[in-house]
Amino acid sequence: QDWAIEDGALVCLQAGNKKPLRTAHWITRSIDTAGGSVDLSVDIAPADRGSAAPPSAFAGFLIGTGGEHVDYRLSALAHHLPAPDGGLLAVVDGDGVVALRRFDQTFAGKAIWSVNTEVALDNLPLLEGQTRAGDGFQDNRTRRCQLKLHIEGTIVAIKAIGVHGDVISTAVATVDDANLLDGAVAMVSSSGPDAAKGRGFAFSHLRGSGEGLLHHPDRAYGPVLCTLYTVDQEVLKLTAQFGPMGEGHAASLDLKNRDGWHQVATSSIEPDSDTATFRVNGIKTLIDTPFRVRFREPDATVESTYEG
């Protein structure tokens, strides 16, 4: 896996030179600049506190992959290598300097997103005509920042804000080709402090607003991906498959009758398989009997449900 949740942050586990540009797609959001302005922001830091990434490493947003003409699930596979309709990178490097880079131009005849090859910054050309300012981080001990992206018509602007609230780097450009902007929204982490064995960047406090940022609640997927069940000799056995969860999680199973929903079982989530297995005795019939699996992150106020 490329990603994990740690202390409320999304952490990229990969920093190797042959696994660059790891992406985590916000599949319930997309950009349509014809609808209005877009604002995105996220806090970024090296995944391992106290470490410093080189200027060849970067993190931030990948926007504009695909669009309404492409299935969003296909766009969500975009990572690693640039390709036609790949979109635009709005990123901050290990020195705290921001840049707008193209992710739609192939190099060396390669146009496959999931291959094992190195990608240099020269393979991700700077967007033409952009104006950049700022020297980035001034303190090697504090390599954290907030990255803000603003789109207004054809104008794209990004800035990195340091831990003391000061703007440490900016970039702005005019983008005449809407295909670079319209489409998917993703976070991207490429390389990191230690390309041999380290991790990439950590993201937290992701926010988005603006009439040009579209919301697609029907695209939400998880944390329960699917369920399988059997009923034999009045025993219900149901397995719920989760996405990657880590350790220390549990889920509940409810059945519904004429009186409403009733919890009938609980199960820990097995960290190796990311499955919760439920067993319920005394099941007379399961014909037209709704069930749901409930899950809540520790200390979370919102509960996720999967119904069948």
Task: Kindly label every feature range from the protein language model.
Residues 40-42, 125-129, 135-173:
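Carbohydrate-binding surfaces in secreted/extracellular proteins
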Residues 25-32, 131-138, 175, 226-227, ...:
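Beta-strand-rich interaction surfaces with strong enrichment in secreted/lumenal proteins
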Residues 169-201:
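Flexible glycan-contacting loops in extracellular carbohydrate-active proteins
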Residues 183, 188, 200-247:
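Non-catalytic, glycine-rich low-complexity segments
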Residues 14-118:
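Secretory/extracellular carbohydrate-interaction modules
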Residues 245-308:
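Extended acidic/polar, glycine-enriched regions
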Residues 1-14:
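Extracellular glycan-recognition surfaces and repeat-rich motifs
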Residues 35-37, 142-144, 235, 248, ...:
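Extracellular Ig-like/FN3 beta-sandwich strand-entry sites
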